[in-house]
Amino acid sequence: MTYSEMGRKIQTAGTWFVGSFMGEILLHYLECCDDVEKKLSFIEYMHKEYGEALEYTYDTTKTKCYAVFSIIKEQKVVEALDYVLQSNDKKVFDGGKENAQAVLDSIRDGKYKLPY
């Protein structure tokens, strides 16, 4: 995945979504990455836990999660979090950058293991 392709995936998911939920999705990635039923169950959880409150349709939540799954699969987590931190998108400031920095710090400190 090139940097440009990663940027398109981030735009698909939404920069704020990537920053806000990369950690949550990473925690569950290994258990559901190769199992379609578990992946859909996780997306259902994400939708009920967060998507409904954000007024996303189920399909919107699914699209956003799949975009983040592909970033993880292509081993671009650190680059994606850096992208979020460098973003000028004003919407990203509502917790997105703080969460991205916290996940990045945890990865760098070894507290957070990447699935690759």
Model-based region annotation:
Residues 38, 42-49:
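Double-stranded DNA-binding cores of transcription factors and transposases
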Residues 1-8:
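Basic, low-complexity segments
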